[in-house]
Swiss-Prot record:
Chain's gene name: apeB
Keywords, sorted A to Z: Aminopeptidase, Hydrolase, Metal-binding, Metalloprotease, Protease, Zinc
EC annotation from Swiss-Prot or TrEMBL: 3.4.11.-
Source organism: Pseudomonas aeruginosa (strain ATCC 15692 / DSM 22644 / CIP 104116 / JCM 14847 / LMG 12228 / 1C / PRS 101 / PAO1)
CDD domains assigned: M18
Entry's Gene Ontology cellular component terms: cytoplasm
Name of the protein: Probable M18 family aminopeptidase 2
One BP term from GO: proteolysis
Family: Belongs to the peptidase M18 family.
Amino acid sequence: MRAELNQGLIDFLKASPTPFHATASLARRLEAAGYRRLDERDAWHTETGGRYYVTRNDSSLIAIRLGRRSPLESGFRLVGAHTDSPCLRVKPNPEIARNGFLQLGVEVYGGALFAPWFDRDLSLAGRVTFRANGKLESRLVDFRKAIAVIPNLAIHLNRAANEGWPINAQNELPPIIAQLAPGEAADFRLLLDEQLLREHGITADVVLDYELSFYDTQSAAVVGLNDEFIAGARLDNLLSCHAGLEALLNAEGDENCILVCTDHEEVGSCSHCGADGPFLEQVLRRLLPEGDAFSRAIQRSLLVSADNAHGVHPNYADRHDANHGPALNGGPVIKINSNQRYATNSETAGFFRHLCQDSEVPVQSFVTRSDMGCGSTIGPITASQVGVRTVDIGLPTFAMHSIRELAGSHDLAHLVKVLGAFYASSELP
């Protein structure tokens, strides 16, 4: 099972270079499992025992498995994750012609580690909006092949390179995509015209706009002398999206189960399709009668907010509290912060520990050092937006927000197992 789950994750990562592609990948799996797509613009007619999903902005998704008992009686079991990862996004007018090379201006999305982006074989993917035959359309594109690189400056020309040299995002991150002939002009939108024709057989009248991100073409892989690790891009947080989907599709029981995968977590979640927007609440309200039904159902519900945790790096062990250092392959991590950077409380943490013990899954705890700041997740945002009790958890990871992250190869199976137990649980605290 472990090898199969890990290969499924590797395939999912390869098919999901952007939040748009990740959402499309999740939707394909759901449809193959018999889930029916709902359109927010239409009236919904859901049924007891029904399987549904809904997307927003092509980059966020909510999957719904309705049980036999009413949510007013048993509540919802929700698992939350996010589809976005730090990256470099192409600017609207990106062409930079310098010294005979064509580069594309990029904007940094989220809290990316810059240095790992250098000397990588980069490709480009995302969503393009265009007009064809007088009609406005959007399509996902993925160049797939390596079309760009950000070369490092040789150490002979930068002797301070290994002494904490700061990287200027404006000047040093624009990738090189081509060498220009003397007098040659470049139009990035013409490249998108060609890609639309190549990938979709569409001849666009004009490309109107796009949301495109560079990504590393190197596939994720199982690594380590004994295959102990998984290395790959976007493990934060497609690892949790994949685990939540596997748990939902394979969970036993007959409860009301929800998987929420939202965009824009890395930039604060404040959007119409992010966790700090109305997406989840609006969907849940449409599954319930009017009046006080929503409040009653939510108070019987629980959210597991799944987002990667910081594992103890052997070279930097002092960056962790000595008693709260999660180990790779040590199982899911319960995240705790007294200042509500995580939404975990004693009741929700105790329930998650109970699930892990019953499932024979190891479990760990993370609290940041008292002299360091703490990141956050969709957990507190969703808890405050919807009013649902929440536990923040995640799998331990190295190099979070790098172009290539590292997680334990045993931990995915641990997480899928305990999330499956959560979905199947007939009683919540």
